[in-house]
Swiss-Prot record:
Name of this chain's protein: SH3 domain-binding protein 2
Lineage, highest ranks first: Eukaryota, Metazoa, Chordata, Craniata, Vertebrata
InterPro entries hit by this protein: PH-like_dom_sf, PH_domain, SH2, SH2_dom_sf, SH3BP2, SH3BP2_SH2
Span of the annotated motif SH3-binding: 201-210
Residues covered by the SH2 domain: 455-553
Residue positions, PTM Phosphoserine: S277, S414, S425
Biased composition (Low complexity): 313-327
Post-translational modification: Phosphorylated. Phosphorylation at Tyr-446 may stimulate the activity of the LYN kinase.
Biased composition (Acidic residues): 170-184, 437-446
Sites of Phosphotyrosine modification: Y174, Y183, Y446
Gene3D superfamilies, per the entry: Pleckstrin-homology domain (PH domain)/Phosphotyrosine-binding domain (PTB), SH2 domain
This protein's record includes keyword Phosphoprotein: yes
GO biological process: signal transduction
Swiss-Prot/TrEMBL keywords: Phosphoprotein, SH2 domain, SH3-binding
Length: 559
């Protein structure tokens, strides 16, 4: 028996599939089978492999043109081949296993595409493991594969009687456990690309994005550095970013556009009375300019009333009463502002005395000034100014937004109709400003917005991602450029998966990291995955002529 054992061949480690097939003699059977993964992380994976039975050894390759085997093992010591009913699933309907006489040796699992294929493979394996036991075991005719199923499997699955002691524990079997480390960058030969774009099932424990689990893996610095940046702004930024463009950007444009219009009435109407009543012109004009502005705008409201109906007497009487009320408010406000600022103390008495004159002056030329001041109420930024002091307090201190905060409540309480009218008209003025500023600020805001959580898919399998993509469309036709980011099946990095409508399949791009920079190809480096994704929204992906990132998976809002 020992002499027989010496004749068991040892699998060759560096031989291509085609070389093995063309070797004279020895090849019993060759074809594609699904092989179960060998490590704990690959137990649920059944990648398709090109399997060759050659001289009592089994080799499996990634494809029929691979230059070297993915793994190989000798059938020495294996004494039984059986159906693997426990491994039967909807994807693996015809599995079988090759069992060693020693429980310390690995049991190999394969899955055929049909019942006849399984019978054929099991018959050939049975014949190979019984090669040196033909005198004890009847040779099995492969033609039995078409015979009765029970009788066939009964003969094939019967164990071969061999001695355990004659099979040493050390052998020359080997297997590359990085068998699923193949991420094809499609249609382009390159150093990073392996021979096939097979997809692999899900069984990678850590989820893709959540922060709590990532720190547990100390050996994943780049994944941690990537995810630690994105979750922190995920919750806070969306509310401010939705609020800021409405409150911040629109008032800035409104103020830029309205600043000139506000200066014009301030110069035309109140400028001459200031010179008469306020001799010092050093820093006083800026203060009364803002003080008189609210009062003057209130006088514009009565000015609008006589202009629209065209009645002079009633409008003058109502406007005078409004002028008295507003002048009192202005007196209080001016005394408050003067007391807070402190430089001029002699101004409060003359200013209220002149205030009714300003109002009358504004009322007398109402027919002529109506054309000038008619656009002022709709353009006056009453609603936004309430929100502006927060950003504008530091940006434009010279405009003195603080005095405007205090008169606003009084002015809004006294003429509710006028304020509501300005509110409606200002909504019309705010919409174009939002559209204009949205284009300018969108790039800056987008750089700060992290990728949505839905982009990160908790799977290591491309076919699972393809299933998710097809589920987004009732007809099973995903949008071109639909993309997500999944985990790598064996590495600690990420994989960008993109739906290519032209070829009707997903494309896988490994996301590499070097010196805290991310890239798909070495020529273009990015500081973060988000900036890389943004880049490929406008630039064609590597190894493709027209594929762009267009639609993040699971994100319904605008980009």
């Amino acid at each position: 028996m020992a002499a027989e054992e010496m004749q068991w061949p040892v699998p060759m480690k560096a031989i291509g599939a085609q070389n093995l097939l063309t070797m004279p003699g020895g090849v019993a059977k060759a074809g594609y089978l699904h092989k179960k993964g060998g490590t704990q992380l690959q137990l649920l994976k059944w990648p398709l492999r090109f399997v060759i039975i050659h001289k009592r050894c089994i080799y499996y390759f990634k494809s029929s043109t691979s230059a070297s085997p993915q793994g190989a093992f000798s059938l020495s010591g294996y004494n039984r081949v059986m159906r693997a009913a426990e491994e039967t699933t909807s994807n693996n309907v015809f599995p079988f296993k090759i069992i060693h006489i020693s429980k310390k040796h690995r049991t190999w699992f394969f899955s055929a595409s049909s019942e006849d294929e399984r019978k054929s493979w099991m018959a050939f394996v049975r014949r190979e493991i019984g090669h040196f036991h033909e005198k004890k075991e009847l040779p099995l005719d492969t033609s039995d594969s078409s015979s009765d199923t029970d009788s066939f499997y009964g003969a094939v699955e019967r164990p071969i009687d061999i001695s355990l002691s004659s099979y040493p524990m050390d052998n020359e079997d080997y297997e590359h456990e990085d068998e699923d480390d193949s991420y094809l960058e499609p249609d382009s030969p390159g150093p990073m690309k392996l021979e096939d774009a097979l997809t692999y099932p899900p069984a990678y424990p850590p989820p893709p994005v959540p922060v709590p689990r990532k720190p547990a893996f100390s050996d994943l610095p780049r994944a941690h550095s990537f995810t630690s940046k994105s979750p922190s702004p995920l919750l806070p930024p969306p509310p401010p970013k939705r609020g800021l463009p409405d409150t911040g950007s629109a008032p800035e444009d409104a103020k830029d556009a309205l600043g000139l219009r506000r200066v014009e009435p301030g110069l035309r109407v109140p400028a001459t009375p200031r010179r008469m009543s306020d001799p010092p012109m050093s820093n006083v004009p800026t203060v009364p300019n803002l003080r008189k502005h609210p009062c003057f705008r209130d006088s514009v409201n009565p000015g609008l009333e006589p202009w629209t109906p065209g009645h002079g007497t009633s409008s003058v009487s109502s406007s005078t009463t409004m002028a008295v009320a507003t002048s009192r408010n202005c007196d209080k406000l001016k005394s408050f502002h003067l007391s807070s600022r402190g430089p001029p103390t002699s101004e409060p008495p003359p200013v209220p005395a002149n205030k009714p004159k300003f109002l009358k002056i504004a009322e007398e030329p109402s027919p002529r000034e109506a054309a000038k001041f008619a656009p002022v109420p709709p353009v006056a930024p009453r609603p936004p100014v309430q929100k502006m002091p927060m950003p504008e307090a530091t940006v434009r201190p010279a405009v003195l937004p603080r005095p405007e905060n205090t008169p606003l409540p009084h002015l809004q309480r006294s003429p509710p109709d006028g304020q509501s009218f300005r509110g409606f008209s200002f909504e019309k003025a705010r919409q174009p400003s939002q559209a204009d500023t949205g284009e300018e600020d969108s790039d800056e805001d987008y750089e700060k917005v992290p990728l949505p959580n839905s982009v990160f898919v908790n799977t290591t399998e491309s076919c699972e991602v393809e299933r998710l993509f097809k589920a987004t469309d009732p007809r099973g036709e995903p949008q071109d450029g639909l993309y997500c980011i999944r985990n790598s099946s064996t590495k600690s990095g990420k994989v960008l998966v993109v739906w290519d409508e032209s070829s009707n399949k997903v494309r896988n791009y490994r996301i590499f990291e070097k010196d805290s920079k991310f890239y798909l190809e070495g020529e273009v480096l990015f500081a973060s995955v988000g900036s890389m994704v943004e880049h490929y929204h406008t630039h064609v992906l590597p190894s493709h002529q027209s594929l762009l990132l267009r639609h993040p998976y699971g994100y319904a809002g605008p980009r």
